Curated annotation (Swiss-Prot):
It comes from Buchnera aphidicola subsp. Schizaphis graminum (strain Sg). It catalyses: 2 6,7-dimethyl-8-(1-D-ribityl)lumazine + H(+) = 5-amino-6-(D-ribitylamino)uracil + riboflavin. GO terms for biological process: riboflavin biosynthetic process. 2,4-dihydroxypteridine 2 binds at residues 48-50, 62-67, 101-103, 137. Lumazine-binding repeats lie at residues 1-97, 98-195. One of its GO terms (molecular function) is riboflavin synthase activity. This is Riboflavin synthase. Transmembrane segments: none annotated. Its EC number is 2.5.1.9. Disulfide bonds: none annotated. Keywords: Repeat, Riboflavin biosynthesis, Transferase. Catalyzes the dismutation of two molecules of 6,7-dimethyl-8-ribityllumazine, resulting in the formation of riboflavin and 5-amino-6-(D-ribitylamino)uracil. The gene is ribE. 2,4-dihydroxypteridine 1 binds at residues 4-6, 146-148, 160-165.
């Protein structure tokens, strides 16, 4: 589990592309490397991956076929940077919201507005079925960053990015048309799906 508070960014130093998976290596800072061991879970742009090999400062991960298809990790190039968050441990501060690291789909950046210290990012959702989980002032994770939804228009939503997040993550480097990983709030999904199922069940009993 993760919190959506990014610990740092890491540079991709190599990518070995095979038929059904990629093996890629990233350069971790000393802070990100602290107590890291093989088998640990680490979020990359919000996507949970498992440490395969460590050769400080390089850390190696495998990216499976389904992850390549459903996240922006499949379009990474050498030299790109990714947001990194180590997994949540007992006693850690819960600064964002609970994130599983299971990316639902990607979204496309459709608009970026900058005015003084106000940075507003609009994102177009590719999978329209996710829109039923996206609510005004609800939680959402974009590339592993815990954010609050500020507006919704059809299949697009926007979030505001504070200066601290801009300086400590990759979000400030993003351009219009680029893909970002999206994970909707787990609890919102449960509430929406359960309510929908119960309403459907109640309606069906009326016609028995």
């Amino acid at each position: 589990m993760f919190t959506g508070i990014v610990n740092g960014i890491a540079r991709v130093v190599s990518i070995n592309k095979k038929k059904n998976f990629h093996t890629y290596t990233v350069n971790f800072s000393s802070i990100l490397l602290k107590n890291l061991k093989i088998g640990d879970s680490v979020a990359h742009n919000g996507c949970c991956l498992t440490v395969k090999y460590i050769n400080c400062p390089h850390v190696v991960f495998d990216i499976m076929k389904i992850t390549i298809a459903n996240t922006n990790l499949g379009v990474l190039n050498i030299g790109d940077y990714v947001n990194i968050e180590r997994s949540l441990k007992y006693g850690d501060e819960m600064g964002g919201h609970i994130i599983s690291g299971h990316i639902m789909n990607t979204g496309e950046i459709s608009k970026i507005s900058k005015l003084d210290k106000n940075y507003i990012l609009w994102c177009k959702v590719k999978d329209l079925s996710l829109m039923k989980y996206i609510f005004y002032k609800g939680f959402i994770a974009i590339d592993g960053i815990s954010l609050t939804i500020n507006n919704i228009i059809k299949n697009e939503f926007c979030v505001s990015i504070i200066p601290e997040t801009l300086s400590s993550t990759t979000i400030g480097f993003k351009k219009i048309g680029q893909l970002v990983n999206i994970e909707i709030d787990f609890y919102t999904q449960i509430i929406v799906d359960t309510t929908k199922r119960l309403i459907k069940k109640d309606i069906s009993t009326l016609f028995k």
